[in-house]
Each structure stands twice: as C-alpha cells, then as structure tokens.
C-alpha cells in the first residue's frame, strides 16, 4: 500500500510537525508507566485483549482527543521482552472522540488527520527499540518524535518532510514517487 494522508481541509496549510505538536499538547501524557497503569490509561485492541488489527486510546487529560493505530499489533505484557508492542503498523488516525473497539473496529468520531501506508514493522525481539513500540508508546506519552522520524523517512522519497504542509504532502503523494529515470520525468 502506498503512503497516503487524509485530513480535514482546515489543516491543509499546517505542517505535519505543527499539527502533531498541537495534537500532542492537547492529548498530553496518559502516564502509562510502572505503578501508574489503569484501564483508563491502557487503551485497547480491536480483535483481542493483547493483540489485534487496531490499538486505540483516548487522552486521560480531556477524555476526547484520541488516536487509532492500525495494522497487525501485539502487546507482550509480561512475556519477554515485557511491555512491548510489536508487529506491523500500517495506519494512524488522530482526532476527537473514540468509538468502537469491543464488537466493531475503532473509529475517530471527529477525524483530523490519518496516515496510511506507513509500512512500519518491529519484531518482538527488538523490544522497546522497535519502531512500532517507539511510535505508539511515544504517542501515548504525548511525544511525536518517533513518528516524525518515521514520517521523515517516508516523505524523503517525495522530497518532503514533516515541515511540509498537508496540502503539499497530498499533492506529492497523488503523483507518487518520481525517480530521475521515470518515463514521466524523461518526457518532460
């Protein structure tokens, strides 16, 4: 699946970095740390208790701001390496209001931004060093650094970065990755 971005048109002029910074400051840190784990700050999986096709959580600061991670995700809990999320991360959606999860897929009720075709993966043995764990746990902690690093790696193929606006990214991804020897560029 090719990388894609969908967004509310009001965010078209925002850079990805600025949007994620705004989202993180609103979402906050759910404080899912040793000694502080509760149902409210643990989120949930669609498809199983510790694994599934989605992981989602709402902010503990405002109970509204949320994100949904899609792919094939598994959480180790006490299996080694303990407390590690791994697998395939294909999509991320951000916005307000979270529905579903028990008998239906999670969805954001008021979506802001979604990224598809992320194609990020980690093995269980990578533990907390795996990109899937770093991105999702980072978001749970209100830290978008790992996600921005991953997005920069993807956007570099389009000559863009997280400092590019959503409108710029959408235009570039609609055209696709162009290589110097692409027939489209040679004909120009």
From Swiss-Prot:
It comes from Serratia marcescens. InterPro entries: HasA_haem-bd (IPR010495), HasA_haem-bd_sf (IPR036912). Monomer. Pfam families: HasA (PF06438). This is Hemophore HasA. GO terms for cellular component: extracellular region. Can bind free heme and also acquire it from hemoglobin. Conveys heme from hemoglobin to the HasR receptor which releases it into the bacterium. HasR alone can take up heme but the synergy between HasA and HasR increases heme uptake 100-fold. The gene is hasA. It is found in: Secreted. Gene3D superfamilies: Haem-binding HasA. Transmembrane segments: none annotated. Keywords: Heme, Iron, Metal-binding, Secreted. Induction: By iron depletion. One of its GO terms (molecular function) is metal ion binding. Heme binds at residues 32, 75.
